[in-house]
Amino acid sequence: MARGMKLACVVLVMCMVVIAPMAEGAISCGAVTSDLSPCLTYLTGGPGPSPQCCGGVKKLLAAANTTPDRQAACNCLKSAAGSITKLNTNNAAALPGKCGVDIPYKISTSTNCNTVKF
C-alpha cells in the first residue's frame, strides 16, 4: 500500500509538471490521478479492473468534455504510463474497453495527444 501511495504521489507531481503550461480550464493531472488510482493493480498486471477503477475511468471521460480537456487527460495518462514500473501495456490499452467506455486513443507512452479531439 505504501509503495502504491508513493507511486501515486510521483505520478501526481509529474502530471502537474506536464500540465502546468496548458491553458486554464483544462482537466488537471491531479483529477486524472485521483480518478484512476484504483486502476494501478490492473495496470501492473493484476486481474480485471475493479468497479472503483471503472468508476474512475467513466468519471474521467465525463469530465473531459472539450478538446483541451481530452488532450490534457491524454497527456496525464501518457505521463503516468511512462512512470509506472512494470506497466502491463496490454492492460493499459484494454482498460477503457474493459470498463465499457470508448476513448479515441490508446493509453500508451507513444500516443500523440495533440491529435486527440472531442
Swiss-Prot record:
Keyword Signal: yes
SUPFAM superfamilies: Bifunctional inhibitor/lipid-transfer protein/seed storage 2S albumin
Protein's GO biological process: lipid transport
Signal peptide: 1-25
Keywords: Disulfide bond, Lipid-binding, Signal, Transport
Disulfide bonds: C29-C76, C39-C53, C54-C99, C74-C113
PROSITE patterns in the record: PLANT_LTP
GO-annotated molecular function: lipid binding
InterPro entries, A to Z: Bifun_inhib/LTP/seed_sf, Bifunc_inhib/LTP/seed_store, Plant_nsLTP
PANTHER family to which the protein is assigned, alphabetical: NON-SPECIFIC LIPID-TRANSFER PROTEIN 2-RELATED (PTHR33076)
Family per similarity comment: Belongs to the plant LTP family.
Function: Plant non-specific lipid-transfer proteins transfer phospholipids as well as galactolipids across membranes. May play a role in wax or cutin deposition in the cell walls of expanding epidermal cells and certain secretory tissues.
Name this polypeptide is given: Non-specific lipid-transfer protein 6
